[in-house]
């Protein structure tokens, strides 16, 4: 999957063909466009956070859809919430968060690396994520905090994707709304990071501390039809049987594709040989209102 900014007289070149932008402009989403070579075609699709996660330029390691969905659920995010994301990175999770909080919520996202912050801000503007919905800052939150709380307003949830999230836990507590139950999530690849983060969460009064690893395990499903059998008398089967009971034998020329279904169809599944492995540990905790 590729992302493309369409403009007048532009041309999209790929290994499957050439696609002039003028033939795309004005077409409805879902339209199938044939290449000039006439060999391959592409579909015009509306950009969604899921598609952006698959097509974005990688400036850092990103958070993928299974983790995104799980984090959004466990933080109990809703439209209208105010949320801090620390570690904007390539902006994969930022787009999903913005959709979850819209239309009247707000995402405050922070990035330590200045160039990455500038590139992410440019992408937000190109994707029509208005400043009223998403605010990005270049800031070292571990040293300087989030600059939120009190007159700046509190938030309902915090997400930390940092090398040392335990250094930002105290600052996160200051930014969380003390008048309600709030949640925090820390995304850490290594178990040693989880241990230090859990210790910092306990010291700062967080409760219900849980750690999860979100793994996707795909299964291949097959249609299986049992081989039918027919019965013969022992004498016709050319076998000796002292009690004269009927014997059972498989039909030699049975074709499961052409024969009528007799109800013996089964669906069976098995795990695929290769599965996606560890991405990160997700540590969640709650801060009870005062």
Q: What is each stretch, according to the model?
A:
Residues 1-46:
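N-terminal auxiliary segments of SAM/dcSAM-dependent transferases
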Residues 55-69:
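Conserved SAM-binding loop and adjacent beta-strand
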Residues 78-89, 108:
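Conserved class I S-adenosyl-L-methionine
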Residues 81, 105, 180-182:
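Glycine-centered, small-residue-biased loops immediately flanking beta-strands
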Residues 90-103, 173:
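Conserved SAM-binding loop of SAM-dependent methyltransferases across substrates and taxa
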Residues 106-111, 186:
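Conserved SAM-binding motif I beta-strand of class I
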Residues 110-166, 223:
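S-adenosyl-L-methionine
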Residues 171-266, 272-276:
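C-terminal substrate-binding/active-site "lid" region of AdoMet-derived donor-dependent transferases
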């Amino acid at each position: 999957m590729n992302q493309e900014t369409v403009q007048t007289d532009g041309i999209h070149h790929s290994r499957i063909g050439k696609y002039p932008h003028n033939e795309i402009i004005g077409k409805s989403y879902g339209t199938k466009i044939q290449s000039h070579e006439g060999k391959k075609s592409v579909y015009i699709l509306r950009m969604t956070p899921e598609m952006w996660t698959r097509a974005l330029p990688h400036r850092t390691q990103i958070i993928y859809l299974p983790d995104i969905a799980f984090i959004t659920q466990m933080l109990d995010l809703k439209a209208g919430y105010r949320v801090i994301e620390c570690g904007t990175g390539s902006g994969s999770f930022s787009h999903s968060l913005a959709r979850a909080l819209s239309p009247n919520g707000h995402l405050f996202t922070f990035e330590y690396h200045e160039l990455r912050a500038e590139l992410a801000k440019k992408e937000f503007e190109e994707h029509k994520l208005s400043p009223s919905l998403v605010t990005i800052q270049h800031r070292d939150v571990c040293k300087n905090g989030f600059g939120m709380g009190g007159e700046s307003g509190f938030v309902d949830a915090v997400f930390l994707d940092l090398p040392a999230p335990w250094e930002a836990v105290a600052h996160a507590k200051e930014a969380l709304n003390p008048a309600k139950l709030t949640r925090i999530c820390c995304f850490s690849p290594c178990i040693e990071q989880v241990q230090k983060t859990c210790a910092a969460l306990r010291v700062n009064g967080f409760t219900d501390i849980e750690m999860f690893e979100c793994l996707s395990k795909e299964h291949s499903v097959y249609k299986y039809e049992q081989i039918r059998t027919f019965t013969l008398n022992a004498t016709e089967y050319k076998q000796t049987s002292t009690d004269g009971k009927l014997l059972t034998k498989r039909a030699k020329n049975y074709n499961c594709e052409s024969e009528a279904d007799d109800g013996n169809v089964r669906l069976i599944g098995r795990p695929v040989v290769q599965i996606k492995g560890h991405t990160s540990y997700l540590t969640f905790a709650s801060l009870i209102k005062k």
